[in-house]
Amino acid sequence: MGRSMFRLLFRKMRHHLPQLTGMGLLVMVGTAFFVTLYTIYLSYDDHANRLFRNQHYADVTFYGSFDDNDVAAVTAHENIRLARGRFVRDFREGDVTLRAISLTDGVNTLYLYEGMIPAASDECAVISRHAQARGIELGDTILVDGRELRVTAIIASPEYVYLSQNERALMAEPDRFGVVYVAEGFFKSAYTEIVALGDISKEAADEIGEVIGAARTVVQDNQLNKVLFTSDLKQIRTCAYIFPLIFVLLIIMIVYVMTKRTITLERRQIGVCKAIGVAGGSLLFLYMAQTSFIAFLGAILGCVAAALLCDTIIGLFSTMFEVPGLAYVFYPALCGCVILAFMALGALSVLVSVRSMLK
């Protein structure tokens, strides 16, 4: 009986091949959409947070005019592990605005793509996106405030995952705006920022800011860079769910209509099968198995397509943000859950459409 049921199953699949093929393509596209976007979501979240962690992204930044005593006052707070003063200033060279930032040991450390961290006052490290846009390479010289600086490193920074100049220029053109990191000896004025690491609340940070006379105090979660990261992460996750839902609805509709029509046309065959002792459950399995099998094949192909497309999509996203090492990562649990979900969807769609007819 089992062998004959399987022969009947594949005979019915051949008979409904066009409809099943259409359903399989929808499953494949829906799976590819979801797995691609959700993989990017998981990979982006993982790599970006690793960058923030490993490069010691500042938990709080104080803006104003400070000296070493102010840095010491911040360091003395019980919830602050480390604090560093630094200089930040924008310089305009022709059509290009360069933001020069002094290096801070242990806070907002640089991720090196190539080269060495600047040590002398006539050296600098250039953020990668700006270097690529202007064709800057190691050993080149660039003008900052009329001074020639030799490029010793191409870098990424945890505070510039997004190349944002300010709140009015969230996505600055990389050939018009760049960030360079310089040795502290480049500047001769008071610190303009204090960056600190620590498990500190916004209220406690604001209190410290008042003590040192900061013009503005911003915790990490409110930094423009982190706000953009969090917002994009949520949007990618939302899109990962919204687009596949369209295909899910189409799949349900196709399976429902196809199965209803098939049951109507095969009512006599169903009656004969029941007359010779075939249980209604076995007949139900027959219709559920063909859609689940096609859903399984479509989901497998969708996962393969996602693996092929993911790096290309990440490359497109990389025009908006820069996270070192961001690439396709295979998540077995994700693919497994998607495959099972589409198989269950196919089976349930059949169950809803035929349960009353096979009683």
Predicted feature locations:
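Residue-level signature of the cytosolic catalytic core of signaling kinases
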Residues: 1-2, 328
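Small-residue-rich transmembrane alpha-helices
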Residues: 256-260, 268, 292-324, 332-358
